Amino acid sequence: MMDGFAQDWPTLTHTDNGLAMDQLGGDLPLDVGFEPQTRARSNTWPCPRPENFVEPTDELDSTKASNQQLAPGDSQQAIQNANAAKKNSSRRNAWGNLSYADLITHAIGSATDKRLTLSQIYEWMVQNVPYFKDKGDSNSSAGWKNSIRHNLSLHNRFMRVQNEGTGKSSWWMLNPEAKPGKSVRRRAASMETSRYEKRRGRAKKRVEALRQAGVVGLNDATPSPSSSVSEGLDHFPESPLHSGGGFQLSPDFRQRASSNASSCGRLSPIRAQDLEPDWGFPVDYQNTTMTQAHAQALDELTGTMADELTLCPQQQGFSAASGLPSQPPPPPYQPPQHQQAQQQQQQSPYALNGPAPGYNTLQPQSQCLLHRSLNCSCMHNARDGLSPNSVTTTMSPAYPNSEPSSDSLNTYSNVVLDGPADTAALMVQQQQQQQQMSASLEGQCLEVLNNEAQPIDEFNLENFPVGNLECNVEELLQQEMSYGGLLDINIPLATVNTNLVNSSSGPLSISNISNLSNLSNISNISNISSNSGSSLSLNQLQAQLQQQQQQQAQQQQAQQQQQAHQQHQQQLLLNNNNNSSSSLELATQTASANLNARVQYSQPSVVTSPPSWVH
């Protein structure tokens, strides 16, 4: 096989002066085309091929070594195709065009029983391949033997079979189920990209179809040359969120000027259409005409908005006895006709032909002139009487509390009223009446403010009508305790016993307060509520009160026990003192008795005279 490389290789061309051709490049014309010069054989590896080299046919051809069985007619064509592929292949080893796997395949196939051990494969390489003849020793064979073992382990065409004998190496055989041609490595199965290439090809086709179909519509406005390729990226063809097809952006978004820097920022979030809706009104708001259907729709819309913005008296802390009765809702919408407006002006002196409803829907709520910073109830009643959406704002005497303040009526001063010129006098009269009504309304608001500003000290339970009064003490305590420790209860016991009546409804009536033992319990409740700072139920308060009473009883019992213990100790001390004194007295008496006995014993005997009868 290596005999074909023994031909003479072309040498470097020298000139007459001994210089190589590549050193004369500056002296030659520039239009002369230079062919690549071949280098010396010692300066390159693997060995370069000569220009007219024809690879000889040898028995080590990889087509013969493969385990694929070909028909006799097709074998010649397969060998020619393999040789043509080898000539164009980029793999060139020192021993030829065959790889290690091809050599191992030929070695196993040349055996009689189609199996070889690892040492036999080494031996076959040294004997049959000229390149390995002088590399059989242990020093120079480490590299290529490692490559042999590597290829045996990684290729699917080789199969390892356990040897029957003990202490013998395993057999290596050809796998009959292996695929022909280049075998796939076992550990490199992830590098098999055939499926990925197919999937990628289908994706490219889909992108091209999207470019042809959709990009034309997006690029109607003179696209730049740089946007021809990257325009299709805006469709997101392979996005996981749009697996059904390309995601095309909305036509409401217009494109900016194309840029070479990025294709992602070329879509502007500015809408192509105007943001303002087309109301169909001219710029001049003085002469405004509206249809009845449009006015009714606006009236319903703002009516629901006004209902949502209603301030409930319970939320703002209004009392029921504020002096202003609740007003019913205003009359329903009336069509804005000029004749009907004139009839209403003749019937009621408080009629005002207002502006078109489309431009009064955002007016602020009418509020008392002197109570802008206070929670006045006149604001709620004035809002109920005014309908800012109605074309004809009617202030009927049936709604005496529905007079708007002067600042809300000033909003109509810049609007030209519809009607003939003879209504000027009527307008002056209406303005005077409106001023009078606003003054009376201000007086009512002042009265309400004065009534609400009365001090709490003047509130007397004796004169208060409590015939059908029911009080939920639990809610009262929760509301009072929500002020964060500002509860102060001062209720005389006599007033509680005399003026509070029983009530059958509600979770707890006022009469249950009289069941408390004394004012100290009420003060305990106030102390508990002021310290807690949070809403507690009455049951919890009672439990805490009972707990405090139990603690007090336990403290009293402990004090009594301590006093008894002290008395007992004092009694014991007295007893000890008495015992010591008695023992001292006894010892003293005993000592004195002994002393007397000793004195009597020590005295001399007295000689008495014999009796008279003795002679």
UniProtKB/Swiss-Prot annotation:
Chain positions found as Phosphoserine: 75, 190, 259, 262-263, 268
Entry keyword Cytoplasm: yes
Major site of localization recorded for this protein: cytoplasm
Residue ranges for the DNA-binding region feature of this UniProt entry: 95-201
SMART domains linked: FH
Region (Disordered): 39-77, 182-205, 217-269, 318-359, 389-409
Compositionally skewed regions (Pro residues) per UniProt: 326-335
UniProt-annotated location(s): Cytoplasm; Nucleus
Regions of compositional bias (Low complexity) in chain numbering: 336-351
Residues modified as Phosphothreonine: 44
Keywords from the named record: Activator, Cell cycle, Cytoplasm, Developmental protein, Differentiation, DNA-binding, Growth regulation, Nucleus, Phosphoprotein, Transcription, Transcription regulation
GO cellular component, as recorded: cytoplasm; nucleus
One GO-annotated biological process of the protein: regulation of DNA-templated transcription
CDD domains the record matches: FH_FOXO
Residue intervals passing through the bilayer: none
Molecular function terms, GO-annotated: DNA-binding transcription factor activity; DNA-binding transcription factor activity, RNA polymerase II-specific; RNA polymerase II cis-regulatory region sequence-specific DNA binding
Compositionally skewed regions (Polar residues) per UniProt: 63-77, 221-230, 256-265
Biological role: Transcription factor involved in the regulation of the insulin signaling pathway. Consistently activates both the downstream target Thor\d4EBP and the feedback control target InR. Involved in negative regulation of the cell cycle, modulating cell growth and proliferation. In response to cellular stresses, such as nutrient deprivation or increased levels of reactive oxygen species, foxo is activated and inhibits growth through the action of target genes such as Thor.
Subunit structure: Interacts with melt.
Name of the featured protein: Forkhead box protein O
Lineage: Eukaryota, Metazoa, Ecdysozoa, Arthropoda, Hexapoda
